[in-house]
């Protein structure tokens, strides 16, 4: 999203582009980590380097959650794609949308299908590829 020029991006589940040492918290870029052989280790303390992503049983970033909810509340249009909307808390974010243009794109049905103004049951990759091809 950032590479496409989006200014307000809330990475609720984190990003592999940021990495840090689990022991001393030194930051590492994705390029630095990818250049390492084997398990990535910190050059400062020898600790294991972990991507800044949320793993099972880890807490989500509250600022990212609150920012996401507020952005959804203020959105003129909400496009949700490639998710069954079954995993919470992110699945519940759709309920904060108060606008009148909800677009759902997913291969299978979701519990929010009945609220969608535009519903597409297909692969998000296929739908977006077709949209780009038609726009060009």
Which residues does each PLM region occupy?
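Conserved catalytic alpha/beta core of Sir2/sirtuin-type deacylases, generalized to analogous enzyme cores
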Residues: 1-136
